[in-house]
C-alpha cells in the first residue's frame, strides 16, 4: 500500500482502466451494446468521462483520468441507473454475456520516461492507431529497468528521432510490474513506415541501448490496437 501511495503521488497522471476481454464470437453484439451505453450516457449527461481503446485481440479499455483515491469511491452512474430503471441493469447483463473476464485497475503515466516534442504530452488527435509495447520485470530489477528506459529516451533525443512515445507503468490492482510504451500513428501502414525510418535514424547502436532494458525484462509483448473516439465519452459543458 505504501508503495502504491508513493507511485500515485509521483505520477504525472493516474488513470482508472476498466478492461473487458471480449469473446470473438460476441464482438458484434458487444459493439452494439457499447454504442447503446454511450448513447444513454449522452442522453443522461453522465458526470464522468473516459477514453476508449480496443486491441486487435478484442480487449476493450475504458480509461478515466483520476486525481486521487477518493475518486474511486464515487458512484457517477448512480443517477443514470435510477433514471433508467431496469433497463440499466439489463444492459449490463447483456454486456456480461460478451466476455468471460473483465476487471478494473490503475495505471500511471510517466512523463519522465516519455519521449515527446517540447510542450506536448498527448498523441496528435488524428493518430488513433496504436502499438503498445509491454516490458515486464521482477521487482528486484525496478531500478535497472528505469535506468534502461531513461537511456533509451536519451538515445532517441540524441539521434533526433521523431518517433515519439508515451510511457505508462503498472499501478494498484495489478500483480506484475511493467512499463508500457504507447506509440501512435495514423494507421497500420503509417506505423510500419515510420518504424522503418526510425530504425535508420537510430542505426545499429540501438541494440546496445535496447539491451539495457531487454536484459532485465522477464518477458515482452507487442500489441496493436486503436483508440475509439466513437465509444469515448465526456459530459456536456455549459
Descriptions of predicted regions:
Residues 1-13:
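Bacterial Sec-dependent N-terminal signal peptides
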Residues 10-207, 211-238:
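Short S/T/G/P-rich N-terminal loop/turn motif that feeds into the first structured element of a domain
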Amino acid at each position: 500500500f505504501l508503495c502504491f501511495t508513493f507511485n500515485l503521488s509521483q505520477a504525472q497522471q493516474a488513470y482508472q482502466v476498466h478492461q473487458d476481454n471480449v469473446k470473438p464470437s460476441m464482438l458484434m453484439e458487444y459493439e452494439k451494446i457499447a454504442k447503446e451505453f454511450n448513447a444513454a450516457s449522452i442522453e443522461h449527461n453522465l458526470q464522468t468521462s473516459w477514453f476508449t481503446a480496443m486491441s486487435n485481440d478484442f480487449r476493450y479499455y475504458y480509461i478515466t483520468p483520476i486525481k486521487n483515491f477518493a475518486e474511486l469511491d464515487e458512484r457517477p452512474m448512480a443517477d443514470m441507473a435510477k433514471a433508467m430503471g431496469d433497463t440499466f441493469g439489463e444492459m449490463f447483463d447483456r454486456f456480461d454475456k460478451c466476455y468471460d473476464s473483465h476487471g478494473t485497475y490503475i495505471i500511471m503515466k510517466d512523463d519522465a520516461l516519455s519521449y515527446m516534442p517540447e510542450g506536448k504530452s498527448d498523441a496528435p488527435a488524428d493518430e488513433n492507431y496504436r502499438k503498445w509495447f509491454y516490458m515486464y520485470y521482477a521487482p528486484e530489477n525496478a531500478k535497472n529497468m528505469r535506468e534502461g528506459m531513461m537511456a533509451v529516451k536519451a538515445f532517441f533525443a540524441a539521434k533526433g528521432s521523431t518517433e515519439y512515445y508515451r510511457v505508462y507503468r503498472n499501478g494498484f490492482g495489478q500483480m506484475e510490474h511493467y512499463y508500457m510504451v504507447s506509440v501512435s500513428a495514423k494507421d497500420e501502414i503509417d506505423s510500419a513506415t515510420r518504424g522503418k525510418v526510425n530504425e535508420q535514424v537510430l542505426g545499429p547502436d540501438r541494440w546496445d541501448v535496447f539491451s539495457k532494458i531487454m536484459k532485465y525484462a522477464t518477458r515482452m509483448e507487442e500489441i496493436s490496437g486503436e483508440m475509439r473516439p466513437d465509444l469515448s465519452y465526456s459530459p456536456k459543458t455549459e
